Swiss-Prot record:
Record-linked NCBIfam families: rplP_bact
Pfam families xref list: Ribosomal_L16
Upper taxonomic lineage: Bacteria, Bacillati, Mycoplasmatota, Mollicutes, Acholeplasmatales
Record text on subunit structure and interactions: Part of the 50S ribosomal subunit.
The name this protein goes by in its record: Large ribosomal subunit protein uL16
Length: 140
């Protein structure tokens, strides 16, 4: 699973995912990309599930770029514990995704756009947000 090697703080403040993405909103590497249409927290397990879905479909004919990384830890207190006595322990790692962010990029060596589009469609079903598939050069 994806997670940072070291962090400055174990339990950071929660970051907002409202508004538009300021960075990573241009297709840099691949021919097609999966772009977020809404903001959310995406867990490391969801990113990994999407990556596996794409690479299994494309086999060895393509390359996948992942543009998001789960830097933020979310905490949770144990069940049936009274309020107070500090913040809970880190439960999972999430990536903060805002509207317009390029999540994944794909390039097929056989230059088959059908394969690229289908791989991104399969990956989009693994994510908890609405997404759209964009071709390089088109408006994100």
């Amino acid at each position: 699973m994806l997670m940072p090697k070291r962090t400055k703080y174990r339990r950071p403040h929660r970051v907002s995912f409202e508004g538009k993405s300021k960075g990573k909103n241009v297709i840099a590497n691949g021919n097609h990309a999966l772009v977020a249409k809404e903001g959310a927290f995406i867990t490391n397990k969801q990113i990994e599930a999407a990556r596996i879905a794409m690479t299994r479909y494309m086999k060895r004919t393509g390359k996948v770029w992942i543009n998001i990384f789960p830097h933020l830890s979310l905490t949770k207190k144990p069940l049936e514990v009274r309020m107070g006595s500090g913040k809970g322990s880190p439960e999972e790692w999430v990536a903060v995704v805002k509207t317009g962010k390029v999540l994944f990029e794909v390039k097929d060596t056989t230059n088959s756009s059908k394969v690229e589009m289908e791989a991104l469609r399969l990956a989009s079903h693994k994510l908890p947000i609405k997404t759209k598939i964009v071709k390089k050069g088109a408006e994100v």
